[in-house]
Amino acid sequence: MSRQAKDDFLRHYTVSDPRTHPKGYTEYKVTAQFISKKDPEDIKEVVVWKRYSDFRKLHGDLAYTHRNLFRRLEEFPAFPRAQVFGRFEASVIEERRKGAEDLLRFTVPIPALNNSPQLKEFFRGGEVTRPSEVSRDLRILPPPLIPTPPPDEARLLQPLPAERRGQEELEVPVDPLPSSPAQEALDLLFSCDSTEEASSSLARGPLSEAELALFDPYSKEESTGPSPTHTGELAAIEVESKRLDQEPWEPGGQEEEEAEDGEPAPAYLGQATELITQALRNEKAGAYAAALQGYQDGVHILLQGVSGDPSPARREGVKKKAAEYLKRAEMLHTHLP
């Protein structure tokens, strides 16, 4: 299988819409967006519903892989501990939602994690769709419900024995799915070429610098600075950053704003400008992981907002800007020592 996932797509993860499953536990909607670097309007989306125990298992698997990468640039995110009492409180549910989202977003700039077989398996069962072509109403499941079962099903909801209470969260149901075109489409979004190499490397001990450099563009970041070419690019970025602070995103600038009856620029442009401006500063300061996340978040907001923008000229300008910063993010992977 080719490395299409790493080379052709940027990723954006969200965890949202917690709801109560009919069996009594809380589950969360997990959305993975794969944005084509060649065409920012080409977006593939995978949606799955997961519970706390699924996130906890993924956290353990990815933490193990991360430890064996010997990365010194960032700390692997912590994850909320399991608890029996209070797990249905709003604050606990929100803490778990945020912890799960932080975990998924942490994997984005690390190829060994974002193309891992564990992450691909986590999204197994989700259908690959194109949000721009499919009505979202068809993808939204019914709202949270706690149904009242008919009398003949009452026995299914009997309370667990005392010795089993508290263990329900820690159990991960196994539900193998047969191969299908939908799963083949999912496989194409996750590159697992180096699965066998990674497994053998973990078994024989720490990875060498040369091995890390094959799939980790930040492996030498702590010991070496940016290349001369990249230093020159960052000088230009500083000028671009100052311009972003002063100019709107519209291709026609102030004249276009006046031509549109003085209406203020849409809110999504301001949000994206703030994120991408900070990303430019982070890149200049050498905080490449933070810069990459900032580019992705900013482009995500642009692509979400531009679809409803009433101005054709502004839509065209925003699409060009999104493409520019997708390329900027790609350079963080390909141009660093």
UniProtKB/Swiss-Prot annotation:
Residues 253-263 have a biased composition (Acidic residues). Residues 265-337 form the MIT domain. The modification Omega-N-methylarginine is found at residue 105. Residues 141-151 have a biased composition (Pro residues). Pfam families: MIT, PX. Keywords: Cytoplasm, Cytoplasmic vesicle, Lipid-binding, Membrane, Methylation, Phosphoprotein, Protein transport, Transport. The keyword Protein transport applies. Residues 1-130 form the PX domain. It is found in: Cytoplasm; Membrane; Cytoplasmic vesicle membrane. GO terms for biological process: protein transport. Residues 133-156, 244-270 are annotated as: Disordered. InterPro entries: Intracell_Sig-Traffick_Protein (IPR051866), MIT_dom (IPR007330), MIT_dom_sf (IPR036181), PX_dom (IPR001683), PX_dom_sf (IPR036871). CDD domains: MIT_SNX15. GO terms for molecular function: phosphatidylinositol binding. SUPFAM superfamilies: MIT domain, PX domain. The modification Phosphoserine is found at residues 201, 227. It is a peripheral membrane protein. Belongs to the sorting nexin family. The PX domain mediates interaction with membranes enriched in phosphatidylinositol 3-phosphate. PANTHER family: RIBOSOMAL PROTEIN S6 KINASE (PTHR15508), SORTING NEXIN-15 (PTHR15508:SF9). May be involved in several stages of intracellular trafficking. Overexpression of SNX15 disrupts the normal trafficking of proteins from the plasma membrane to recycling endosomes or the TGN. This is Sorting nexin-15. The lineage of its organism: Eukaryota, Metazoa, Chordata, Craniata, Vertebrata.
